[in-house]
């Protein structure tokens, strides 16, 4: 999967670890949660 930035990773991508996984359709898989709260974002940033 493609890494994405969770809200807990910090305000910017540069210098921060990306702990989420990008899911484009259907929301996050079972047992995962969306870790990205708001902002212009395509798909869902999911985390176990």
From Swiss-Prot:
It comes from the Eukaryota. It holds the Pfam family Toxin_4. SUPFAM superfamilies: Defensin-like. Its main location: secreted. GO terms for molecular function: sodium channel regulator activity; toxin activity. GO terms for cellular component: extracellular region; nematocyst. Keywords: Disulfide bond, Ion channel impairing toxin, Nematocyst, Neurotoxin, Secreted, Toxin, Voltage-gated sodium channel impairing toxin. It is found in: Secreted; Nematocyst. GO terms for biological process: regulation of signal transduction. Disulfide bonds join 4-45, 6-35, 28-46. Belongs to the sea anemone sodium channel inhibitory toxin family. Type I subfamily. Binds specifically to voltage-gated sodium channels (Nav), thereby delaying their inactivation during signal transduction. Thus it strongly stimulates mammalian cardiac muscle contraction. This is Delta-actitoxin-Bcg1a.
């Amino acid at each position: 999967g493609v890494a994405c930035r969770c809200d807990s990773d910090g305000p910017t991508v540069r210098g921060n670890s990306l702990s989420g996984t990008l899911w484009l359709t259907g929301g996050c898989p079972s047992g995962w949660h969306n870790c990205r709260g708001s902002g212009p974002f395509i798909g869902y940033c999911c985390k176990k």
